[in-house]
Each structure stands twice: as structure tokens, then as C-alpha cells.
């Protein structure tokens, strides 16, 4: 078996391939670090008034929380 006259991967081609394969990974890692730094540097508000979760209606039955009306087609309960 004869070897090709021009090698498929020469020294220049290898460094070129390594550069173009490592560049997207390095760029993605850099952007992820910058994004995480941005998220962690934001001050969290102690009183988030726009986030208000009222869990009491979930622990009560519908008759206790005043949600007694039924929707059309829901007279007997859930039908799967």
C-alpha cells in the first residue's frame, strides 16, 4: 500500500483544525461565565410584591374557598 504524496493532516492543518474546533467551545464557556456572573451580581429584592402566591385555596375543598361554580361539561367531575 502506497502512502499518499500529500498527508491529509499536516502540521498547519492540524493547528487550523484545533483552532476552529476549540474556538466555539471556548466562546461558549466565556459567554456562560459572563452570563452567570451577571445573574449572580443582580441584587435580589427582599419584598417581591409582584410575586404573591396564595396557597390556602389549594389546601381547601372548593366549597370552603367559594369556588363552587362548575364549568360546562364538568358536572360529574373529570372524565378521562
UniProtKB/Swiss-Prot annotation:
Transmembrane segments: 16-36
Gene: Adig
Keywords: Membrane, Nucleus, Phosphoprotein, Transmembrane, Transmembrane helix
GO term, biological process aspect, one: brown fat cell differentiation
Family: Belongs to the adipogenin family.
Name recorded for this polypeptide: Adipogenin
Record organism: Mus musculus
InterPro entries the record matches: Adipogenin
Residues bearing the modification Phosphoserine: 63
Tissue-wise expression: Selectively expressed in adipose tissue where it is particularly enriched in brown adipose tissue. In adipose tissue, expressed exclusively in adipocytes and not in the stromal-vascular cell population. Expressed at much lower levels in heart, stomach and muscle and barely detected in kidney and lung.
Membrane topology recorded in Swiss-Prot or TrEMBL: Single-pass membrane protein
Induction note: Induced during adipose conversion of 3T3-L1 cells. Up-regulated in 3T3-L1 adipocytes by troglitazone which stimulates PPARG expression during differentiation. Down-regulated in 3T3-L1 adipocytes exposed to TNF-alpha and to retinoic acid.
Biological role stated in the UniProt entry: Plays a role in stimulating adipocyte differentiation and development.
Pfam families: Adipogenin
